[in-house]
Swiss-Prot record:
It catalyses: acetoacetyl-CoA + L-isoleucine + ATP = tenuazonic acid + AMP + diphosphate + CoA + 2 H(+). It comes from Gloeophyllum trabeum (strain ATCC 11539 / FP-39264 / Madison 617). The lineage of its organism: Eukaryota, Fungi, Dikarya, Basidiomycota, Agaricomycotina. PANTHER family: FATTY ACID SYNTHASE, NONRIBOSOMAL PEPTIDE SYNTHETASE. Residues 995-1028, 1116-1144 are annotated as: Disordered. Residues 522-919 are annotated as: Adenylation (A) domain. This is Hybrid PKS-NRPS synthetase TAS1. GO terms for molecular function: 3-oxoacyl-[acyl-carrier-protein] synthase activity; ligase activity; phosphopantetheine binding. InterPro entries: AA_adenyl_dom (IPR010071), ACP-like_sf (IPR036736), AMP-bd_C_sf (IPR045851), AMP-binding_CS (IPR020845), AMP-dep_synth/lig_dom (IPR000873), ANL_N_sf (IPR042099), CAT-like_dom_sf (IPR023213), Condensatn (IPR001242). Residues 1027-1104 form the Carrier domain. GO terms for cellular component: cytoplasm.
Amino acid sequence: MQFITGPKLNGAAASTGALSPEVIAVYPMTKAQESLWLAYSMAPNHTLYNLSLKFVFNQTEAASDGSIAIRDLTRRHAILRSTFHGANQSQARPFVAEHNPDTATASFRIVPKPRDARGEAKVLGLLRTAVNLSQEFASRWLAVVSDREIELYLVAHHIALDGTSMSSISAELFKLLSGSPATPAEQPFCQAHMYEVITYIVRRFSSRRILTPFKAAFSASPEYQAAERFWLDQVMHVRPYKWITNPSSRPAPSKSYREIQTWFDFSKDDLAAWGSKYRTSWFRVAVAMVGLLTRAHTEPDYGADQTVTVAFGGRPAGLEKSIGHFANAMPIRIPFTEASRKTSGAAQVSFDNLVKLVSKQISTAKKHERYSILDLSRARASRGLETPRAQVAVTLSPKLSHKECTLYPVEGPYDLFFCFLEGDDNVTLGVIYDPIIFSTADVARLKDEFSSLRERSMTDPSFGVSGISGVQSHLPRLLPELDLSNVDEISAARFHAWFEQQALAHPNLVALHSAERNLSVTYKELNERSNRLGHYLREIGISRGSLVLLYLEHGPAVMEWIIAVLKAGAAYAVADQSNPPERIRSIVSVAEPVLVIHDQKGEAIREIIQESPVKTLDIRTVQIEKFSSESLEEVTQNTDLAYIVFTSGSTGQPKGVEIEHRNLSHFVANAFTSNYTTIGPGTRVLQLATFAFDAAVLEWSQCLSLGGTLCFADVPKALVGDYLADVIDLNEVSFMHLTPSVLATLPTSRPLPSLRQISVGGEMVPDNLIKKWRSRVQVVNAYGPTECTVVMAHQPQPIASDAPQPAANIIGAAHQHMKFYVSNDAFTRLLPAGEVGEVCIGGPQVGRGYKSRPDLTENRFAVHPELGARLYRTGDRGKLLGDGSVFLVGRIDREVKVRGDIELDDVERTITDVMPEVTAVSVQPDSSSTSLWAFVSPDDIDGDVLRNRLTERLPAYMVPSTVYALPQLPLNMNGKVDHKSIAANMESLIVEATTSGSSSSATPSLVSSGSTTCRSPSTSSCSDSRSASPAITSAVTRIWQDILGTKGLITTSDNFFDLGGNSLSANKLATQLRSEFSSSNITVLDIFSSPTIQGQVDLLCGSELDSYVQSKLDSLGRGRTKSPAKIVDSQGRSSPSTIPSGGRKSEIAIVGISGRFPGASNPDELYRLFRDRKEGISELEGSSGVLPFPGAIYVPRRGAIKDVEYFDPAAWGLKEDEARNMDPQQRLFMESTLRALQDANRVPSIQGTNNIGLFVGAARDTWQDATETVYGDEFYRTHRADLTPSISARTAYHLNLQGPNVTLNTACSSGMVALSVAVDQLRAGRCDMAVAGAVAIAFPQEGYVTAESQIFSPSGHCRPFDHRADGTLPADGVCALVLRPLDDAVRDGDKIYSVISGIATGSDGRLDKAGVTAPSPRGQADTIERAWKDAGIPMSKAVYAELHGSGTPIGDALELEGFQMARSRLGAANNRCTVGSNKGNLGNCEAASGLVSVIKMCKSMQYGVIPPVQSLERVNPLINPSLPFDIAQTDLPLSDDAVVCVSSTGLGGVNAHCVLRS
C-alpha cells in the first residue's frame, strides 16, 4: 500500500478574508466537516488530512484533453469549487462557499517526470503542500508527464472528499477521458449547488427519515437524544492508550512524520469465510481484533475500556454517489470488561463473545451515524468531561473503478491507523504509525501478532484471549488459579500468598501510590520489603498464634506491616492513633497482643502498657537490610486467626471480632466470582477507611490480591467534599468504598473522569443519593457485618437513566458459598420468602466470634436447631425475596411501639425519599413513647414541609410530631449516625435546635448580622486578631458551637477535633466559614492545618482584609489581582495559603496569538528560529560616540524588530502626522492585537457592543524622548506626555474593545502580569474575552553601553545557563494573546493553542533579598507555588519550564534555586525537569519577554516539540550541580497531555508564573 508522507512543510497561515464575488451560495458545514475544520484551524500547515488519488494512463489512451475533463468535473461537482470559512458576523457556524461553475478554475499543474531524487522530492513536495481552505479550492490536480505515460494526481483535503467520493470520481474521470459522458441518473446533482440538492431531496422523498439530516430540528428530536445516549456510552469510562512501548528508552526516530507498512493482501473469499465464522462482516471481526491487539500493548487498567475510531458512511438515501465529505469517524468502545467472565480464579474473554459485542456496537452505531464527534465533544464538555483523543483507527476504503487508480490514505492524527483498501479480488491492509511512539521493530511485532491472531480465529472462533501475550496482564486472576467452586480449596488459600503471586507475575505493577507524596511502590518492592519484615518478626519471636497490635500513622507503612505479620504466621489488630486513651486501653486489654508496633507517636501507647508484659517495637529502629527478601515458609492453618477488628459494644467496651484466614480467603474469592467489584491489574482503589475498620480490609485485600493499585491520601481524615474529589482526580481513582454520609459530601459538579465504581455500605443508603450517582458510575449497595468478613452480598444499581432503580433496602443475593436465612425472633424456625424476621447468615465467611467473650459469641454465632448449622444473627430485620436477595426492614433493636409497631429505619428511609435535601436522620420515640421525634440535618430543613410530605406516604401514627433540624447529627467512630447517642441526649439536642430556630416551625436559623473586616495597622497578617477582629472571632465561635452541638465555653486555642470534630464536621465547618465570609477560600485541609478558632481567624482575617482593599480599589475604578491569604507561623515566617484548584471552570484557553520579534515577523517564524537554534540579533551601524564612563564598552548589537517604521495610517483612520506622533509601541501593538483577533476569528464589529478586555504590559515610552512632534496645537505639544492615551486605551478605541482596560509596567514581567490580570478578570466574569499583550520597543534603535560584570553582556551574546554567560542583551518585541474561558472555547469550536491552568504574580518584598534589584529565590518560589496551587495540578507533572533565563550568571543560578525551592514545597523535589530560555535567540524583550515565552510554548504544543536553547557548552559553574534539572540541548517531544510552565521576573522583584497544558 502506498502512502504520501514526509516532514511538515511550511505554508500560508489560515486566512479568513472576504468572500470572493464569484461565490454563488453558502451553507453550513456538516458537523463532521466542522471537526476537520477545527483541526485545520489549529494546524493549517499540516497535511495530515490530505487524501490523494492517482491515475496512470498511456499518452495514446487519453482520447480527450485531461484539462477539459478536470474542468468538467469541477463544473459538475460543487464541492470541487468550494472554499471553507470560519464563523463570522453573518454566519453563526463555519460554512462552505460555493463558487460560480462558469468561472471556477481548478488548480492544475503539469510537471515533467523527474529523473533523479531531487526531482522526485520536488514532486513529493508539490503533492504534500498544504492548502489554504479559505482562499483556495480544497482539491488540486497535478500531472506528471513522460513520453509514454501520464500520472495524474488529485489531492484533496479530507474536509471536501471522502473515500467513496474518490471512487466515484475515478469512474467519472475515465468516462470523460474516453469521451463517454456520465449518465445523468448516476449524478443527479452534477451541476447543482447545495440548495438544489435539498430541493431534490424534498421533492423525491417524503419520509422524515430522509429529511431530518437537513433539518435543525434533528438536534431536538428523540432520535438525536437516543444517539447522544449511545455515543456517550461509547466513551464512558474509557481510558487513553498508555502504550507499553517506551520511546525514551531508544534513540530518537530518524523521521518525525508517520510511516506506513503494508501488512497483508487478503482474498475476498478468505475474508468472507472469516466473517461467516462469526456470523457478521469480516470488517467487524477485524475491528474487534485491532481492539484486542492494541490493548495487549497498553498498560493494564482493568475495568476501563479503549475505543477504536471507525469511519461510518453517513450518506442519506439518495446521496449514495454524491461527491463530497460524508464520512463520520466515531469512537467504538471495545467492551473488553463486559466480555470478561470470571471462572476458575481468573477472568476469561472468549474472542467470539468480544466480536459479538463489538458487532452489536457497530450495528447500533450505524443507526446513529448522523451524530458527529463535534456533537459528542460538546455533550461531554457540558458535563465537564473531555472527549478522549482518537489514538487507534480502522477504515475500509472502497474499491476504485480501474486498476490504473491508486488511493493514498490520509495520514491522520492517530498513533496507529489500520487501513483496509479494497481491490478487485483482494483487500490490502496497511498500517500507518507514529514513529515517535512505535519503532519499526514494534510494528513488525504487531504484524506477527495480528497474523497469529487471525490464524487462530479462523480455526477456533471461541478461543480464550488470556493466552495471548500481553492480554493476560489485563485480566484479574487469583494466583495460583484454583477451583473457586470448591470450598476447601478456597479455605486453604491465603491472601498473602495471592499477593505474593501477583508480585511474581507482575513485579513492575504499582501496588501502593500517593500522588500528593509523589510515592509509588511496585509489587516487587512491597513484596520484598514485607518478606524482610516477616523474617525480622520471626527472629524476634513472632510466630503462628501471636497477635501483633499496630499503632501506626495512617499510610503505606501500615500495609507493609499487615502483610509482614500475616506472612510471619501471626494475626494483627489496629489501634487508631486518633482514639482516646481509654479506648486504646480497652483494645489492648481485649486483644492481649504480644507485641505493639509503633512509630514516632508511640509514647501514648507505651504509657498505657507500661505495667504489662507486652513488648513494643519502634519502627524507626528496625534494620531489615540483613534479612532475606525471599518468601517465608507458610505455617498457618485454615482456622488460624488473621486479624481482629474492634466494633462498638453495647456496654461501651469494644468488641473484638475474630476473623480467620479461611474467612478472609473466602471474602476475596467469593466477592471475585460474584462480580462485586471490577478490580484488576491497574485498577486504582482509594484507601479511604482507617485500618482499624473492616472497610479497609475490603480495600486492600481485593486490590492487592488482583493486581490493583492502593491509593493513599495525605490527610485521610479529611477525605470528604472537594478534598476527596481532589484525591480521586490526583490519583486517578477508579474504585472506592464509602459510607453514604461521606458520599453525600462528594460534589456532583466535579467530573471525576477516572471514577468507575462506587461501593456504598455501612448504613442506610438514601435512594436519592444512589440516583445522583448511578448514571455516572457503577454503584453497588454492599452489605456485610464485620462478623461475616466485610461484604457477603451486594446489589448493583443500573446505569441507564431510564432503567428502574431497585429500592435501597434491597441488599442483593449472597455471594458464592454464602447464604441468607430469615429466622423468627426466638431463633427456632426458619421463615419462608416474604415473611419478616431476623436476617441470619451462614457460610465460610462467618467469623470465629468475639475475643474473650464466649457468652456473646454463643448468642450471636449460634447453631440453628432447624438447620443444624452455625449462623450469625445480624440483628437486622428483613425478608427473603423470590430471587434469593434480601429486603431489609430495619434493626431489631430500633423497633418501637408507638400506637403500633414502628420500624424507625422505615420512617427514616421515607424521610430521605420525600426530601432528598436531608443528609442525615434519626427518628426516636418521644419521652412519653406516644409519638415520634425526627432529628435531621442540615439545619435549613423545613419541618412543616417535611411532615406534610410524609402524610402522603405514611399512616398518621408513623409521622413524627416534631422535626428538629441541626447542622449535623452526632456520628459514631465509624462515621455513621449515632442513634444511641441521640437517644441519650435528646433534651440537649432539642434545646440546640429550638434555640437556633431550627425546629419544625421552620423558623430561619440564626445567622450573623454581617462579617466584620479585620484590619491590622501594624502587620500584613492578623496574628493578633483577638484584639483586631472580635466580630470575626465571635462569628467563628458561634459556627463551632452550632456544628459541635454545644453552648459551653470554647476558647480560641481549643482544638476542633479534641472537642469532637471529625472529617465530616470539618467539611461542614469549611463550608459554613466560606458561606459566612464570602471572600475566604478556606478548605477542609485548612481546618486540619489550623484546627483552632485562633488559627482560622488568622486565615479569615487575611482574606477579609483583602476584600476590604479590593472594595476600595474598585471604588476608585482600579482592579488588582487578589493576593492569597498568608499563614503566619510562630517565627513570623509566612507562606502562601492553600489555594483550591479552580478545576475546568477556571481554566483559560489561548485561542489566538500574534507578534513580531527579533528575526521573526510572526509566531511561526519565531518557532522556526528556535527550532534552527538561530540568533535574531541585529548588527547595528554607528557607535555611541563618547563613552559615558571609564571602562564603558559600546556593543553595536540589539534584538531589533524589522520595519518598525512601517505603518498604514489610513487603515486606522489616522492622519499621517498623528500617526507619526504616536509611539511606535502603540502602532505595532494595535496591529498585533488585530492579527491576534483575526487568528482567533474573533474580530469585533466596529458598530456593535462587546465585553472584550484589554490588558497590556508596556515598556516606557522612549519615542517622545527621541523626537519632537509637529502634531497638534501649542497646548498639546507642551503637555504631550500627559495628553497621550495609554496603549490599551488607544487600541481599544480603534478596535472597539469595550471591556476592562489596563496598561501596566513591572519591567520584564509586565506581559505576564498583564496575562495574570486578564485571567483574573475572565475568571471573575468581568469580561467575556480578553486580549493580553505586551510591547517593548526602544528608541533610538542602536546598540548599548555596558561594562564588565554589569547586567548587559559585553560580548554581545546572551547565553542563559552557560559557563560563558556574561549578561543579557536588550531586545524589542510585541505580542498579543486572545483568551477565552475554556468551556466557551470548546463549546464554540475555537482552535486552542494551549490552556492556562494556573497563574500567579507576587513581589519579593524585603526578606531574603540582597537589594531592590537583586532576585529573590524565596520570592520567586512563593509565586511559583501559588501558580501551581491555583492550577490544581501536581508539579511533578511538569515536563518543561521556560524560565526567565536572563543570561546573568548569578541571576540564572538564583532562579534555578527558587524554582527548586517551589518544587520541594510541592512534593516534586526529586522529579527531573527540563528547563530552557529563549533569550539566547532573541535577547531580553523586556516587557514582552514573558509573553514571548508563552507563545513559544503555544507553538511547541502545536508542533509537538520544544526546541532546545540556542547554545550551551557547559553549565554555569554557579548553578548547583545537584539540582534535578536538564538544560534543553535537544528537541523535547511533547505528549498530548503535557504540562509546562513559564516564569517571568521583573527588575525590582515583581514575579509571574503560569502553568500551561495541552
